[in-house]
């Protein structure tokens, strides 16, 4: 199957949602799903589904629907969800602590293996209820050495975000999910995905205000 390497970012962001939908269909013993069924489950239109799928070659035949098991496995392969992906979390403040207790592995095969914070943080040396250890950031290099960990969740204050990012890149981190509302400078080959909660809320309020004007 030929996959277009240059898929739009909007399409890429929907990949995990498609995977979730096909897992749900599979659990409900649905064998075939039309683009309309997929679109309705996603809250988008059928044309968007067909356009997204066109980037991945021949996923189904027009008029026959999409094979649910085949597509579930396809997206599992695409998202590397056949094996467990371990990640680290850096910054054990309010957001960080909440994420440490979030059970990622209940839905997908990924889990937080370790948490890190400043060496003087009271949580350092303890474990969460799910047995996730929290270490001092000065030990991050030795802690992830000889592991397959290449991904980090960053929940540190904005003023420290770039410094910590540089430190993580030095120890081999290739992907960062950042909750810091600042632009991070990273070298080629390192991917940063930003989550700006304030921006998302402001966008929501904008659309709500526009809705009131209609």
From Swiss-Prot:
InterPro entries on file: CoA-bd (IPR003781), NAD(P)-bd_dom_sf (IPR036291), Rex_DNA-bd_C_dom (IPR009718), Tscrpt_rep_Rex (IPR022876), WH-like_DNA-bd_sf (IPR036388), WH_DNA-bd_sf (IPR036390)
Keywords for this protein: Cytoplasm, DNA-binding, NAD, Repressor, Transcription, Transcription regulation
Subunit (UniProt): Homodimer.
Subcellular location: Cytoplasm
SMART domains, sorted: CoA_binding
Organism this protein belongs to: Streptococcus pyogenes serotype M12 (strain MGAS2096)
Domain of life assignment: Bacteria
Record feature DNA-binding region, as residue ranges: 17-56
Protein family: Belongs to the transcriptional regulatory Rex family.
Residues the record lists as binding NAD(+): 91-96
Function statement: Modulates transcription in response to changes in cellular NADH/NAD(+) redox state.
GO terms, biological process: negative regulation of DNA-templated transcription; response to redox state
One cellular component term from this protein's GO annotations in UniProt: cytoplasm
Protein name (record): Redox-sensing transcriptional repressor Rex
Disulfide cysteine pairs (residue numbers): none
Single GO MF annotation: DNA-binding transcription factor activity
Gene3D superfamilies in alphabetical order: NAD(P)-binding Rossmann-like Domain, Winged helix-like DNA-binding domain superfamily/Winged helix DNA-binding domain
Gene that specifies this protein: rex
């Amino acid at each position: 199957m030929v996959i277009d390497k240059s898929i739009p970012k909007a399409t890429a962001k929907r990949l995990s949602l498609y995977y979730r939908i096909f897992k749900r269909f599979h659990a409900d013993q649905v064998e075939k799903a039309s683009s309309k069924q997929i679109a309705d489950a996603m809250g988008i239109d059928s044309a968007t589904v067909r356009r997204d799928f066109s980037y991945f070659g021949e996923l189904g035949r027009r008029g026959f629907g999409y094979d649910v098991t085949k597509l579930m496995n396809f997206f599992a392969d695409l998202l590397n969800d056949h094996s467990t992906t371990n990640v680290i979390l850096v910054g054990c403040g309010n957001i960080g602590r909440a994420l440490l207790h979030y059970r990622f592995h209940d839905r997908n095969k990924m889990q937080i293996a370790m948490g890190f914070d400043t060496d003087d943080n009271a949580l350092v040396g303890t474990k969460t209820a799910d047995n996730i250890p929290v270490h001092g950031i000065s030990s991050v290099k030795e802690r992830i050495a000889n592991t397959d960990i290449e991904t980090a969740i960053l929940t540190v204050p904005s003023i420290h975000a770039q410094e910590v990012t540089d430190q993580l890149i030095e120890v081999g981190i290739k992907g960062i999910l950042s909750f810091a509302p600042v632009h991070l400078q990273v070298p080629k080959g390192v991917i940063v995905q930003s989550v700006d909660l304030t921006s998302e809320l402001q966008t929501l309020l904008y659309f709500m205000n526009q809705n009131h004007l209609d």
